[in-house]
């Protein structure tokens, strides 16, 4: 894998609501494992939902570790629904990520409050 362009991602998950006892719960724990392994192909899959529950401070954490985050996942908290249904200020967060020049992927991993189509309505303002 060292000579490959493949990236292997590790994802911290919250142990407070979704998976009690999960072994990897913070961004720093993931970074420590990556450092211990010492392979340039290892990165963090940063799940905004899980890290809001475990750490808060999403914007500074993303900024500090941007080079190690090639993929983010999103859902609002609480409830794990689409952006705009909970406590995360996604307008601010997306603007911040954009200003940082993020070139990675952002995936949606949430349970729509109603239908899938309605659950994608939040994205319209970002596609203009």
Residue positions per predicted region:
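Short beta-strand segments at enzyme active-site cores
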Residues: 7-12
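Short, small-residue-biased leader/transition segments that mark boundaries at the very start
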Residues: 2-3
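Histidine-acidic metal/acid-base catalytic patches
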Residues: 24-46, 50-128
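Surface-exposed cleft-lining segments at the edges of enzyme active sites
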Residues: 15-22
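Conserved beta-strand edge residues that scaffold enzyme active sites
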Residues: 14-15, 111
